[in-house]
Amino acid sequence: MKESVIRKLEGLLERNEEVMALLGDASVISDQDRFRALSKEYAQLEDVVAGFKAYQQAQVDLDSAKEMLEEDDAEMREMAQEEMKAAKAKLEHLEDELQILLLPKDPDDDKNAFVEIRAGAGGDEAAIFAGDLFRMYSRYAEANRWQIEIMSCNEGEHGGFKEVIMKVSGDGVYGKLKFESGGHRVQRVPETESQGRVHTSAVTVVVLHEVPEAEAISINPADLKVDTFRSSGAGGQHVNKTDSAIRITHIPTGIVVECQDQRSQHKNRAQAMSVLAARIQAVEDEKRRSAEESTRRSLVASGDRSERVRTYNFPQGRVSEHRINLTLYRLNEVMEGDLDAILLPLMQEHQADQLAALADEQG
Protein backbone atom coordinates (compact mmCIF):
# COMPACT_ATOMS: atom_id res chain seq x y z
CA MET A 1 0.00 0.00 0.00
CA LYS A 2 1.23 3.52 -0.80
CA GLU A 3 2.90 5.43 2.02
CA SER A 4 0.47 8.36 1.56
CA VAL A 5 -2.50 6.00 2.07
CA ILE A 6 -0.88 4.47 5.18
CA ARG A 7 -0.37 7.98 6.63
CA LYS A 8 -4.01 8.85 5.96
CA LEU A 9 -5.17 5.66 7.69
CA GLU A 10 -2.91 6.31 10.68
CA GLY A 11 -4.44 9.79 10.96
CA LEU A 12 -7.95 8.29 10.96
CA LEU A 13 -6.93 5.76 13.62
CA GLU A 14 -5.63 8.61 15.78
CA ARG A 15 -8.83 10.60 15.23
CA ASN A 16 -10.92 7.57 16.16
CA GLU A 17 -9.13 7.34 19.52
CA GLU A 18 -9.67 11.09 20.10
CA VAL A 19 -13.39 10.80 19.35
CA MET A 20 -13.71 7.75 21.62
CA ALA A 21 -12.11 9.72 24.47
CA LEU A 22 -14.35 12.74 23.83
CA LEU A 23 -17.48 10.58 23.93
CA GLY A 24 -16.59 9.63 27.49
CA ASP A 25 -16.09 13.27 28.53
CA ALA A 26 -18.83 14.61 30.85
CA SER A 27 -18.91 18.04 29.15
CA VAL A 28 -19.50 16.39 25.76
CA ILE A 29 -22.18 14.04 27.13
CA SER A 30 -24.09 17.04 28.51
CA ASP A 31 -23.98 18.81 25.10
CA GLN A 32 -26.47 16.77 23.03
CA ASP A 33 -25.63 18.33 19.64
CA ARG A 34 -21.89 17.76 20.05
CA PHE A 35 -22.41 14.25 21.44
CA ARG A 36 -24.65 13.39 18.47
CA ALA A 37 -22.13 14.78 15.94
CA LEU A 38 -19.22 12.88 17.54
CA SER A 39 -21.27 9.67 17.74
CA LYS A 40 -21.99 9.98 14.01
CA GLU A 41 -18.28 10.58 13.26
CA TYR A 42 -17.32 7.57 15.39
CA ALA A 43 -19.79 5.37 13.47
CA GLN A 44 -18.39 6.62 10.14
CA LEU A 45 -14.81 5.81 11.21
CA GLU A 46 -15.68 2.37 12.58
CA ASP A 47 -15.36 0.30 9.38
CA VAL A 48 -12.17 1.92 8.09
CA VAL A 49 -10.50 1.68 11.53
CA ALA A 50 -11.44 -2.01 11.88
CA GLY A 51 -10.15 -2.65 8.35
CA PHE A 52 -6.84 -0.87 9.03
CA LYS A 53 -6.31 -2.74 12.32
CA ALA A 54 -6.88 -6.03 10.47
CA TYR A 55 -4.40 -4.84 7.79
CA GLN A 56 -1.79 -4.03 10.47
CA GLN A 57 -2.28 -7.48 12.04
CA ALA A 58 -1.90 -9.19 8.66
CA GLN A 59 1.35 -7.24 8.15
CA VAL A 60 2.60 -8.48 11.57
CA ASP A 61 1.66 -12.05 10.58
CA LEU A 62 3.59 -11.68 7.30
CA ASP A 63 6.70 -10.38 9.08
CA SER A 64 6.52 -13.26 11.60
CA ALA A 65 6.24 -15.78 8.77
CA LYS A 66 9.29 -14.25 7.05
CA GLU A 67 11.28 -14.71 10.27
CA MET A 68 10.18 -18.35 10.45
CA LEU A 69 11.76 -18.91 7.02
CA GLU A 70 15.16 -18.56 8.70
CA GLU A 71 14.47 -21.66 10.83
CA ASP A 72 16.53 -24.82 10.23
CA ASP A 73 13.49 -27.08 10.59
CA ALA A 74 12.06 -27.95 7.14
CA GLU A 75 8.52 -28.35 8.52
CA MET A 76 8.68 -24.88 10.10
CA ARG A 77 9.84 -23.39 6.79
CA GLU A 78 6.97 -25.09 4.96
CA MET A 79 4.51 -23.75 7.54
CA ALA A 80 6.06 -20.29 7.13
CA GLN A 81 5.51 -20.44 3.35
CA GLU A 82 1.81 -21.24 3.87
CA GLU A 83 1.40 -18.47 6.44
CA MET A 84 3.12 -15.96 4.12
CA LYS A 85 0.79 -16.93 1.29
CA ALA A 86 -2.30 -16.49 3.51
CA ALA A 87 -1.06 -13.17 4.94
CA LYS A 88 -0.29 -11.76 1.46
CA ALA A 89 -3.75 -12.75 0.19
CA LYS A 90 -5.36 -11.14 3.24
CA LEU A 91 -3.31 -7.94 2.81
CA GLU A 92 -4.35 -7.73 -0.85
CA HIS A 93 -8.03 -8.19 0.02
CA LEU A 94 -7.89 -5.64 2.86
CA GLU A 95 -6.06 -3.12 0.67
CA ASP A 96 -8.89 -3.27 -1.90
CA GLU A 97 -11.46 -2.94 0.88
CA LEU A 98 -9.68 0.06 2.44
CA GLN A 99 -9.37 1.81 -0.94
CA ILE A 100 -13.18 1.69 -1.24
CA LEU A 101 -13.69 2.83 2.36
CA LEU A 102 -11.39 5.82 1.71
CA LEU A 103 -13.31 6.98 -1.36
CA PRO A 104 -14.73 10.48 -0.91
CA LYS A 105 -18.24 10.31 0.50
CA ASP A 106 -21.02 12.32 -1.11
CA PRO A 107 -22.04 14.68 1.72
CA ASP A 108 -25.64 14.42 0.52
CA ASP A 109 -25.83 10.62 0.89
CA ASP A 110 -27.02 10.78 4.50
CA LYS A 111 -29.82 13.23 3.71
CA ASN A 112 -33.52 12.54 3.35
CA ALA A 113 -34.89 12.44 -0.19
CA PHE A 114 -37.85 13.52 -2.28
CA VAL A 115 -38.90 10.85 -4.79
CA GLU A 116 -40.95 12.23 -7.69
CA ILE A 117 -42.73 9.62 -9.83
CA ARG A 118 -44.43 10.79 -13.05
CA ALA A 119 -46.38 8.82 -15.62
CA GLY A 120 -45.00 9.31 -19.12
CA ALA A 121 -45.96 7.71 -22.43
CA GLY A 122 -48.62 5.03 -22.10
CA GLY A 123 -51.65 6.81 -20.66
CA ASP A 124 -53.60 4.86 -18.03
CA GLU A 125 -51.09 2.00 -18.02
CA ALA A 126 -48.23 4.44 -17.26
CA ALA A 127 -50.21 5.88 -14.34
CA ILE A 128 -50.91 2.38 -13.00
CA PHE A 129 -47.21 1.53 -13.22
CA ALA A 130 -46.33 4.79 -11.45
CA GLY A 131 -48.53 3.46 -8.63
CA ASP A 132 -46.65 0.14 -8.73
CA LEU A 133 -43.32 1.96 -8.40
CA PHE A 134 -44.69 4.03 -5.51
CA ARG A 135 -45.62 0.77 -3.77
CA MET A 136 -42.19 -0.74 -4.56
CA TYR A 137 -40.36 2.23 -3.00
CA SER A 138 -42.74 2.20 -0.02
CA ARG A 139 -41.95 -1.48 0.62
CA TYR A 140 -38.22 -0.82 0.28
CA ALA A 141 -38.47 2.10 2.72
CA GLU A 142 -40.36 -0.09 5.17
CA ALA A 143 -37.64 -2.78 4.98
CA ASN A 144 -35.02 -0.10 5.75
CA ARG A 145 -37.12 1.38 8.58
CA TRP A 146 -37.42 4.68 6.73
CA GLN A 147 -40.41 6.99 7.09
CA ILE A 148 -42.61 8.02 4.16
CA GLU A 149 -44.72 11.13 3.74
CA ILE A 150 -46.76 11.95 0.62
CA MET A 151 -46.08 15.56 -0.33
CA SER A 152 -48.35 15.75 -3.35
CA CYS A 153 -50.28 13.39 -5.59
CA ASN A 154 -52.43 13.49 -8.70
CA GLU A 155 -54.25 10.18 -9.06
CA GLY A 156 -54.81 8.39 -12.36
CA GLU A 157 -58.35 7.90 -13.66
CA HIS A 158 -58.01 4.09 -13.59
CA GLY A 159 -55.66 3.75 -10.62
CA GLY A 160 -52.09 4.67 -9.85
CA PHE A 161 -50.77 8.20 -10.20
CA LYS A 162 -50.23 10.73 -12.93
CA GLU A 163 -47.73 12.20 -10.48
CA VAL A 164 -46.80 11.53 -6.86
CA ILE A 165 -44.10 13.13 -4.72
CA MET A 166 -43.02 11.36 -1.55
CA LYS A 167 -40.53 12.36 1.11
CA VAL A 168 -38.42 9.49 2.46
CA SER A 169 -36.67 10.09 5.79
CA GLY A 170 -34.07 7.95 7.54
CA ASP A 171 -30.42 6.90 7.57
CA GLY A 172 -28.62 6.97 4.22
CA VAL A 173 -31.79 7.46 2.17
CA TYR A 174 -30.40 9.62 -0.66
CA GLY A 175 -27.21 7.54 -0.90
CA LYS A 176 -29.27 4.55 -2.04
CA LEU A 177 -32.29 6.05 -3.78
CA LYS A 178 -30.31 8.54 -5.92
CA PHE A 179 -29.59 5.69 -8.36
CA GLU A 180 -33.33 5.46 -9.14
CA SER A 181 -33.42 8.73 -11.11
CA GLY A 182 -34.18 8.21 -14.78
CA GLY A 183 -36.67 6.58 -17.15
CA HIS A 184 -38.33 3.33 -16.04
CA ARG A 185 -40.00 1.33 -18.83
CA VAL A 186 -42.65 -1.34 -18.30
CA GLN A 187 -43.68 -4.05 -20.77
CA ARG A 188 -46.85 -5.98 -19.92
CA VAL A 189 -50.37 -6.84 -21.07
CA PRO A 190 -52.83 -4.27 -19.64
CA GLU A 191 -55.96 -5.65 -17.97
CA THR A 192 -58.06 -3.86 -20.60
CA GLU A 193 -56.17 -5.51 -23.49
CA SER A 194 -58.45 -8.19 -25.00
CA GLN A 195 -55.96 -9.39 -27.66
CA GLY A 196 -53.22 -10.19 -25.12
CA ARG A 197 -50.76 -7.78 -26.72
CA VAL A 198 -47.83 -6.47 -24.70
CA HIS A 199 -47.85 -2.69 -24.28
CA THR A 200 -44.84 -0.53 -23.43
CA SER A 201 -45.26 2.41 -21.05
CA ALA A 202 -42.83 4.78 -19.38
CA VAL A 203 -42.50 6.42 -15.98
CA THR A 204 -39.94 9.02 -14.95
CA VAL A 205 -38.40 8.97 -11.48
CA VAL A 206 -36.51 11.95 -10.06
CA VAL A 207 -34.76 11.68 -6.69
CA LEU A 208 -33.67 14.90 -4.98
CA HIS A 209 -31.94 15.24 -1.62
CA GLU A 210 -33.64 17.33 1.02
CA VAL A 211 -31.99 20.69 1.62
CA PRO A 212 -31.71 21.50 5.35
CA GLU A 213 -32.79 25.04 6.19
CA ALA A 214 -29.25 25.95 7.26
CA GLU A 215 -27.91 24.97 3.80
CA ALA A 216 -30.83 26.16 1.68
CA ILE A 217 -30.25 28.52 -1.20
CA SER A 218 -31.76 31.90 -0.42
CA ILE A 219 -35.06 32.27 -2.28
CA ASN A 220 -36.24 35.82 -2.83
CA PRO A 221 -40.00 36.03 -2.06
CA ALA A 222 -40.28 38.50 -4.94
CA ASP A 223 -39.27 35.66 -7.30
CA LEU A 224 -42.27 33.57 -6.26
CA LYS A 225 -45.77 33.48 -7.71
CA VAL A 226 -48.14 31.81 -5.24
CA ASP A 227 -51.59 30.54 -6.27
CA THR A 228 -54.18 28.86 -4.07
CA PHE A 229 -56.82 26.48 -5.41
CA ARG A 230 -59.22 23.79 -4.27
CA SER A 231 -57.79 20.28 -3.92
CA SER A 232 -58.82 17.75 -6.55
CA GLY A 233 -58.82 13.97 -6.65
CA ALA A 234 -60.07 11.30 -4.31
CA GLY A 235 -60.57 12.23 -0.70
CA GLY A 236 -63.98 10.96 0.43
CA GLN A 237 -65.09 12.56 3.64
CA HIS A 238 -61.68 14.19 4.03
CA VAL A 239 -61.65 16.00 0.69
CA ASN A 240 -60.71 19.66 0.98
CA LYS A 241 -63.66 22.05 0.92
CA THR A 242 -61.45 25.16 1.02
CA ASP A 243 -58.79 26.64 -1.24
CA SER A 244 -55.98 25.09 0.80
CA ALA A 245 -53.95 23.67 -2.09
CA ILE A 246 -50.86 25.66 -3.07
CA ARG A 247 -49.04 26.19 -6.36
CA ILE A 248 -45.70 28.01 -6.17
CA THR A 249 -43.84 29.14 -9.29
CA HIS A 250 -40.19 30.15 -9.04
CA ILE A 251 -40.09 32.77 -11.80
CA PRO A 252 -36.28 32.80 -12.54
CA THR A 253 -36.13 29.02 -13.16
CA GLY A 254 -39.74 28.34 -14.15
CA ILE A 255 -39.93 25.54 -11.56
CA VAL A 256 -43.53 24.89 -10.44
CA VAL A 257 -44.47 22.97 -7.29
CA GLU A 258 -47.98 22.01 -6.18
CA CYS A 259 -48.93 20.63 -2.77
CA GLN A 260 -52.48 19.67 -1.83
CA ASP A 261 -52.09 16.70 0.48
CA GLN A 262 -52.50 18.59 3.76
CA ARG A 263 -55.79 20.20 4.84
CA SER A 264 -54.00 23.33 6.03
CA GLN A 265 -52.82 25.93 3.50
CA HIS A 266 -49.91 26.75 5.83
CA LYS A 267 -48.73 23.10 5.84
CA ASN A 268 -49.12 22.79 2.08
CA ARG A 269 -47.07 25.96 1.59
CA ALA A 270 -44.31 24.67 3.90
CA GLN A 271 -44.18 21.36 2.02
CA ALA A 272 -44.18 23.10 -1.36
CA MET A 273 -41.30 25.34 -0.27
CA SER A 274 -39.22 22.33 0.87
CA VAL A 275 -39.75 20.59 -2.50
CA LEU A 276 -38.99 23.85 -4.35
CA ALA A 277 -35.74 24.29 -2.39
CA ALA A 278 -34.72 20.72 -3.30
CA ARG A 279 -35.46 21.28 -7.01
CA ILE A 280 -33.55 24.58 -7.15
CA GLN A 281 -30.63 22.92 -5.33
CA ALA A 282 -30.73 20.06 -7.86
CA VAL A 283 -30.40 22.58 -10.72
CA GLU A 284 -27.36 24.12 -8.98
CA ASP A 285 -25.89 20.67 -8.27
CA GLU A 286 -26.30 19.71 -11.92
CA LYS A 287 -24.46 22.87 -13.05
CA ARG A 288 -21.61 22.04 -10.66
CA ARG A 289 -21.49 18.38 -11.73
CA SER A 290 -21.44 19.32 -15.41
CA ALA A 291 -18.46 21.56 -14.78
CA GLU A 292 -16.64 18.89 -12.74
CA GLU A 293 -17.38 16.04 -15.13
CA SER A 294 -16.78 17.82 -18.41
CA THR A 295 -13.86 15.47 -19.05
CA ARG A 296 -15.36 12.30 -17.59
CA ARG A 297 -19.01 11.36 -17.10
CA SER A 298 -20.15 8.71 -14.63
CA LEU A 299 -23.05 6.92 -16.30
CA VAL A 300 -24.19 5.09 -13.17
CA ALA A 301 -24.67 8.11 -10.92
CA SER A 302 -25.53 10.77 -13.47
CA GLY A 303 -29.23 10.52 -12.64
CA ASP A 304 -30.13 11.93 -16.05
CA ARG A 305 -33.91 11.94 -15.89
CA SER A 306 -34.25 11.55 -19.67
CA GLU A 307 -32.06 8.44 -19.73
CA ARG A 308 -33.76 5.03 -19.77
CA VAL A 309 -32.28 3.23 -16.79
CA ARG A 310 -34.42 0.12 -16.32
CA THR A 311 -36.98 -2.11 -18.04
CA TYR A 312 -39.55 -4.25 -16.21
CA ASN A 313 -40.77 -7.05 -18.51
CA PHE A 314 -43.75 -8.78 -16.87
CA PRO A 315 -44.37 -11.60 -19.42
CA GLN A 316 -40.77 -12.78 -18.93
CA GLY A 317 -40.55 -11.92 -15.20
CA ARG A 318 -37.42 -9.96 -16.06
CA VAL A 319 -35.82 -6.73 -14.81
CA SER A 320 -33.04 -5.22 -16.94
CA GLU A 321 -30.78 -2.55 -15.45
CA HIS A 322 -29.33 -0.91 -18.56
CA ARG A 323 -26.56 1.13 -16.92
CA ILE A 324 -24.61 -1.95 -15.84
CA ASN A 325 -26.07 -4.60 -18.19
CA LEU A 326 -27.65 -6.47 -15.28
CA THR A 327 -30.59 -8.81 -15.94
CA LEU A 328 -32.54 -10.47 -13.14
CA TYR A 329 -35.39 -12.96 -13.50
CA ARG A 330 -36.95 -12.01 -10.18
CA LEU A 331 -39.39 -9.28 -11.14
CA ASN A 332 -41.94 -10.15 -8.42
CA GLU A 333 -39.37 -9.82 -5.64
CA VAL A 334 -38.15 -6.47 -7.00
CA MET A 335 -41.70 -5.11 -7.25
CA GLU A 336 -42.22 -6.22 -3.63
CA GLY A 337 -39.35 -3.95 -2.58
CA ASP A 338 -36.26 -6.17 -2.91
CA LEU A 339 -34.32 -3.34 -4.54
CA ASP A 340 -30.94 -4.16 -3.02
CA ALA A 341 -30.51 -6.85 -5.68
CA ILE A 342 -30.20 -3.94 -8.16
CA LEU A 343 -28.97 -1.07 -5.99
CA LEU A 344 -25.95 -2.87 -4.48
CA PRO A 345 -24.42 -3.76 -7.91
CA LEU A 346 -25.09 -0.14 -9.01
CA MET A 347 -23.28 1.18 -5.94
CA GLN A 348 -20.36 -1.19 -6.58
CA GLU A 349 -20.13 0.01 -10.18
CA HIS A 350 -20.16 3.61 -8.97
CA GLN A 351 -17.31 2.79 -6.55
CA ALA A 352 -15.36 1.19 -9.41
CA ASP A 353 -15.85 4.40 -11.43
CA GLN A 354 -14.55 6.44 -8.49
CA LEU A 355 -11.51 4.16 -8.07
CA ALA A 356 -10.73 4.46 -11.79
CA ALA A 357 -10.97 8.26 -11.57
CA LEU A 358 -8.70 8.22 -8.51
CA ALA A 359 -6.16 6.05 -10.35
CA ASP A 360 -6.22 8.47 -13.31
CA GLU A 361 -5.57 11.42 -10.99
CA GLN A 362 -2.71 9.64 -9.21
CA GLY A 363 -1.29 8.26 -12.44
Swiss-Prot record:
UniProt region (Disordered), positions on chain: 284-305
Modified residues (N5-methylglutamine): Q237
Listed InterPro entries: PCRF, Pep_chain_release_fac_I, Pep_chain_release_fac_I_sf, Prokaryotic/Mito_RF, RF-1
Alphabetical keyword list: Cytoplasm, Methylation, Protein biosynthesis
SUPFAM superfamilies from the UniProt entry: Release factor (SSF75620)
Pfam families for this protein: PCRF (PF03462), RF-1 (PF00472)
PTM info: Methylated by PrmC. Methylation increases the termination efficiency of RF1.
Described purpose of this protein according to its UniProt entry: Peptide chain release factor 1 directs the termination of translation in response to the peptide chain termination codons UAG and UAA.
Family the entry assigns: Belongs to the prokaryotic/mitochondrial release factor family.
Name of the protein described by the UniProt record: Peptide chain release factor 1
Origin organism lineage: Bacteria, Pseudomonadati, Pseudomonadota, Gammaproteobacteria, Alteromonadales
